[in-house]
Swiss-Prot record:
Binds 1 FAD per subunit. This is Nitrate reductase [NADH]. The gene is NITA. Pfam families: Cyt-b5, FAD_binding_6, Mo-co_dimer, NAD_binding_1, Oxidored_molyb. GO terms for molecular function: FAD binding; heme binding; molybdenum ion binding; molybdopterin cofactor binding; nitrate reductase (NADH) activity; nitrate reductase (NADPH) activity; sulfite oxidase activity.
Length: 864
């Protein structure tokens, strides 16, 4: 967004641009500049997202990709501003796009168990009596990354900076409810529910975010619950709820609904999807599956409201090194907070594993409200001498509140990764710098970013070690080939692991030398290319790049543990040159396999390409063809027959990647067609959430874009019976037997269609296609047409689990060996090939053993 030219310069607030009453533009010399530091432009990361109009500070650390925005500030930025955090660097938790709401159009409806329902405009709201006070907001997931390093929760990785403090201005909720004539609990008014705009989010019956308070909390004058419209004395920004939001001091941020649209007084708590499926701390033994199976989400005792006690160290920060050339004063710093209005009374540091504790100095910025409640964090400091760290292995921090509660020593995992408040524990590592001076490096548990020296947090390192040990243990029980020796990692000059910059990694992007980055570590996957189950291209697609998101989206913990044997060093931002030396430019490794670039081919195995949706074709209740436009009518996909593509999306804050085979090929110019069966939420008891990516496709509107990457896959049908495996092994088949289950038909269909299209292709083809019902059969008309047009070359057989049709002439029930023998080719030699795609259990327990009994070797079976 371009900031309009102003006579006196300055940045106009986005609230004013959306019609809020005038407030003067901000300039660096304005007295309010420091408590706002407004972003001047739209960040390039937000271009091509629904938030492409929201101005954001580029310093924020984005935790869930580009969209939606979930971010926290770096610790040094958070602490730099002191007690009051500028909104531009205040942490943000968004479940979706920030809605663009004009001031004049917004209304707040107050209804339910009230005598006088209200329908307030913003002008009417701000005309009511208001209060202003400072309040610390905290996401319940603050410090979640530490939990995720023990065991993955269902939440993304918050670091220790999901907390911020600002002044809030608004109308007391109690006053509004009294104005509306709220009924009493005796009359059924037990809860006050809040929700944001309808249709804002993909989950829930109305697509809104909502939650509730008890009547007692909402009406308690000591709780200072307000309907806020200003932050640090200026109108709210879009990310913080403009034009209006809830502020509930002492509560977790997840209860403070942004873009507030409706307040409803009810007899029962909010029935909103997010009220139940978010912000809970379940017992440690309850995982996601058990929570769904046994209804743990709906048990009221596990809801989170009040914040717990928590604290963190800001100095020394992660990867900081304190030189020990002299015994010098050093000031440690950090923050602490508590919930429920409780006062922080102690911040303590231990340098001897908790045997003794040193009391820090507390800087308290607020006075309590008239009821004695404290709503803000404190900052603490502790003066030590640098030699005090010399015999310490760890720094421990804990805080106490006025009820004499403190933080637990040990972390407790829960499925949502929420409310982690164990001791803040920093490891201390001795090291010698390039000048030969002894120093100590501090390693925090799980910071969002790598440190300035390229190191990850110690809990992350522990996690990698645990995965490697699990892999070794699993390998030992397999009693297979002798174990390979542990990897030898070349040492850097300082004795640590070899360090590489991203430029050096990028030079290794070929089959001859294939490196990639995962979680700040560098891996050489070259030896594994031929062994990868998905073929070499599945790795080469990320060669020379950071593969963290793509790897995590589709790999299990077992696969992650296998990384250890290919580890070669750590990723660093840059490497200092030796005195008088120059850093040579990395030289790319020569490749003999790089294809020439065709300007009319869309897919690029090295980069994601973004394509717009141009048409939706509804086939039945849950099946669609999504047609995406290519850059011109002359462009083609560039997808060899048998290969597939990856699609990418950020869904509810999670980076999701799925493999699909388009049903259009290179012969259909100007478009890419995806056949998608939508797995809706709450339809199958075993999968109550439905399919993430298929529901994302369902939410697309014409003009929306999807990112694609490819081609990839280990099998290519070259035509006339010839095929290639892993880009190297060229073979020929005279008979091809296909087995497909459900949506697994798409790669099979691509090969069958290509073979039958060529009149010179004499390959004999059979297909057994398994589905649940007749209505579930995808591409039925297309397959029937191919079978009718090529009866001498293509035999088609269906089986369904159930049917009500008296005209059904095919099988009923699961696939059987007898069915395979009747409708597929027995293996009579090396030119017979079996190709399959479907549910893993069907392939593993039925297809593979049946085909083996028909003479097929594992080498003659292709798994798409």
């Amino acid at each position: 967004m371009t900031i309009p030219e102003l006579p006196l310069g300055g940045i106009v607030s986005q609230a004013v641009e959306l019609g809020a009453p005038y407030e003067p533009p901000l300039t660096p010399d304005h007295p309010e500049w420091k408590v706002h530091v407004p972003a001047a432009a739209v960040d390039k990361k937000d271009q091509d997202t629904p938030d492409n109009w929201v101005r954001r500070d580029p310093r924020i650390l984005r935790l869930t990709g580009r969209h939606p925005l979930n971010c926290e500030p770096p610790m040094d930025v958070l602490m730099e501003y002191g007690f009051i955090t500028p909104p531009a660097v205040h942490f943000v938790r968004n479940h979706g796009a920030a809605p663009r709401i004009p001031w004049a159009e917004h209304r707040i409806e107050i209804n339910g168990l009230v005598d006088k329902p209200l329908f307030l405009t913003m002008d009417e709201l701000v005309a009511l009596p208001s209060i202003t006070f400072p309040c610390t907001l905290v996401c319940a997931g603050n410090r979640r990354k530490e939990e995720n390093m023990l065991k993955k929760s269902i939440g993304f990785n918050w670091g220790p900076c999901a907390t911020s403090t600002t002044y809030w201005t608004g109308v007391r909720l109690r006053d509004l409810l009294l104005l509306a004539g709220i009924k009493s609990p005796e009359q059924g008014a037990n809860f006050v529910c809040f929700r944001g705009p309808k249709g804002e989010l993909p989950r829930g019956s109305d697509g809104s975010y909502g939650t509730s308070l008890t009547y007692a909390k909402a009406m308690d004058p000591s709780s200072d619950v307000i309907i806020a419209y200003k932050q640090n004395h200026r109108w709210l920004t879009p990310d913080h709820g403009f034009p209006v939001r809830m502020i509930i001091p002492g509560f977790i941020g997840g209860r403070m609904v942004k873009w507030l649209s409706e307040i409803t007084v009810t007899e029962v708590e909010s029935q909103n999807f997010y009220h139940f499926m978010d912000n809970r701390v379940l017992p440690s033994h309850v995982d996601e599956a058990l929570a769904k199976e046994e209804g743990w989400w709906y048990k009221p005792e596990f809801i989170i409201n009040d914040l717990n006690i928590n604290s963190a160290v800001a100095r020394p920060w992660h990867d900081e090194v304190v030189r020990l050339d002299a015994n010098k004063p050093y000031t440690m710093r950090g923050y602490a907070y508590a919930g429920g209005g409780r006062k922080i009374i102690r911040c303590e540091v231990s340098l001897d594993d908790g045997k003794t504790w040193r009391l820090g100095d507390i800087q308290r910025f607020e006075k309590p409200n008239e009821y004695g409640k404290y709503w803000c964090w404190v900052h603490w400091s502790l003066d030590v001498m640098t030699f005090d760290f010399l015999n310490a292995k760890e720094v421990l921090l804990r805080a106490w509140d006025e009820t004499m509660n403190t933080q637990p020593a040990i972390i407790t995992w829960n499925v949502m990764g929420m409310m982690n408040n164990c001791y803040y524990r920093i490891k201390i590592h001795p090291q010698v710098d390039s000048d030969g001076v002894m120093g100590l490096r501090f390693q925090h548990p799980a910071p969002v970013e790598l440190g300035e020296r390229g190191n990850m947090g110690w809990r992350e390192e522990d996690n990698l070690v645990a995965q490697a040990l699990a892999a070794v243990k699993e390998g030992a029980t397999a009693a297979a080939a002798p174990a390979a020796p542990p990897p030898v990692v070349a040492a850097a000059a300082n004795g640590g692991p070899r360090q590489y910059t991203m430029e050096e990694v990028a030079a290794h992007n070929t089959e001859e030398s294939c490196w990639f980055v995962h979680g700040g570590k560098v891996y050489d996957a070259t030896p594994y290319l031929d062994e990868h189950p998905g073929g070499a291209e599945s790795i080469l697609i990320v060669a020379g790049a950071d593969a963290t998101d793509e790897f995590n989206s589709i790999h299990s913990s077992k696969a992650k543990a296998m990384l250890a044997q290919y580890y070669i060093g750590d990723l660093v931002a840059s490497k200092p040159a030796a005195a008088g030396a120059t850093v040579p430019e990395p030289q790319p490794v020569a490749s003999t396999s790089s294809p020439a670039v065709d300007p009319l081919v869309v897919l690029n195995p090295r980069q994601k390409v973004k394509l717009p949706l141009i048409e939706r074709i509804e086939l039945n209740r849950n099946t669609r063809i999504f047609r995406f436009g290519l850059p011109s009518p002359q462009h083609r996909i560039g997808l060899p027959v048998g290969k597939h593509v990856f699609t990418y999306a950020t869904i509810n804050g999670e980076n999701v990647m799925r493999a699909y085979t388009p049903i259009s090929g290179d012969e259909e110019l100007g478009r890419l067609d995806m056949l998608i069966k939508v797995y809706f939420a709450n339809e199958h008891p075993a999968f109550p959430d439905g399919g993430k990516m298929s529901q994302h496709f369902e939410s697309l509107r014409i003009g929306d874009t999807v990112e694609f990457k490819g081609p990839l896959g280990h099998f290519v049908y070259d035509g006339r019976g010839s095929y290639t495996l892993n880009g190297k092994l060229h073979k020929h088949a005279t008979h091809m037997s296909f087995v497909a289950g459900g949506t697994g038909i798409t790669p099979c269909y691509a090969v069958i269609k290509a073979a039958l299209r060529d009149p010179e292709d004499k390959t004999q083809i059979s297909l057994v296609f398994a589905n649940n019902t007749e209505e579930d059969i995808l591409l039925r008309e297309e397959l029937d047409e191919l079978a009718n047009n090529h009866p001498d070359r293509f035999h088609l057989w269906h089986t369904v689990s159930q049917t009500n049709s008296s005209d059904w002439k095919f099988s009923t029930g699961r696939v059987t060996l007898e069915m395979f023998k009747q409708h597929l080719f027995a293996c009579s030699g090396p030119e017979c090939l079996a190709l399959m795609c479907g549910p893993p259990a069907m392939l593993e327990h039925c297809c593979v053993p049946f085909l083996e009994s028909m003479g097929y070797s594992k080498e003659q079976m292709i798994h798409f």
